[in-house]
Amino acid sequence: MWGIIPGLAISILIATMLGKTAIFTSPIQTMKKETNMENIKVMAVFGTRPEAIKMCPLVLELQKYENITPIVCVTAQHREMLDQVLDIFGVKPDYDLDIMKTRQTLNGITTRVLEGMEDVLRKEKPDIVLVHGDTSTSFVAALAAFYEQIKVGHVEAGLRTYDIYSPFPEEMNRQLTGRIANLHFSPTQRNYDNLIKENIDSEKIYITGNTVIDALKTTVKDNYEFQSECLRSLDFDNKRVIVVTAHRRENLGKPLEDICNAISEIVDEYPDTEVVYPVHLNPAVRETVWSILGDKDRVHLIDPLDVMELHNAISRSFMVMTDSGGIQEEAPALAKPVLVLRKETERPEAVAAGTVKIAGVDKEVIKTLAKELLDNQDEYNKMAHAANPYGDGEASRRICEAILYEFGLKTERPDEF
């Protein structure tokens, strides 16, 4: 990957691995607020389903402002799962790079996004490019914008584990994106503090809450009727339904095997439980999961759910077991305990608030923590009723107002979460 990325990213990588803070300045980073603009062209770039869930509410909010012209560019790093989300939110891309290939590599994704973004950016010449989180699409789109000397706004900025291989490649992606970005939209105070430690200008950081909470206002309905035959058949009222998702690269192989074996043994021990596991389309994930759980009674392996199906399934479930970052934020907002199937999390606010627990990938630890929730109603209630630290449903508005403020079209800095 680094063969196509000159000194900037390599210098950042070296500084990061040495545990040092690199400070980069450029004309676009030191620009004062624009004062003579009447309209801002804002390009939102995303490519995966989790990004789309969190960016679509922002796109819809951008469309409300007369002095903002929104442009949507998708890379389709995840083709089918991305399209599901776009349809639900009614967002139609202006550009679709359509980069997804079977068994695609990180190098391949990087190359195709960088080349595709060059043409789009040169044609549209946006005033600012918005990227989200920690995907390869986000990092490379930010880099492409930097090469064109276009401002970058980083949505969901400041999350850190400080282990560049966990999660991989997401931790490095978000650190590199953070070094490029001109504006940083941090969900929480802790994320803000992380950026301050990295010498990011405090005036360029906005604490907004997380846009995923905005998304839940659209997707979760009390009277929602499931489209999935499997979900329609489940007795959510009389069974304890556990929603499971696990697909991260660092969990492939033995970690995922241990997760699946833990699920199998939990179901054996608790006959009133049902497990719903929407299995990621990655062949490496599907092969492992189906080989261990494919014939298991009361374990329902289904194709990935669209965002409305998933959010409403979580809202009616007993608890969630996941290695997903977004679900660590979504489930607590729906009052569901979460066991995180990872060794660490870049969302420690949830751990501190008591809405999630780190189960890791050890079979016995996963079983022990699951049994605590299944056996102890007080422990369950404590997690389910803990305050969600991630937002109030106003993150997209705050981001839009911050952009207007930065470009001189709003006189007051927006309120913060």
Q: Where do the language-model regions lie?
A:
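A short, histidine- and acid-enriched strand-loop-helix "catalytic/donor-clamping" loop
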Residues: 154-168, 182
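A nucleotide-sugar donor-handling region in carbohydrate enzymes
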Residues: 75, 79-80, 180-254, 359, ...
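Membrane-proximal helix-turn-helix segments that form the acceptor-binding/catalytic region
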Residues: 171-183
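A donor-sugar binding/catalytic signature common to diverse glycosyltransferases
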Residues: 131-132, 154, 184, 311-351
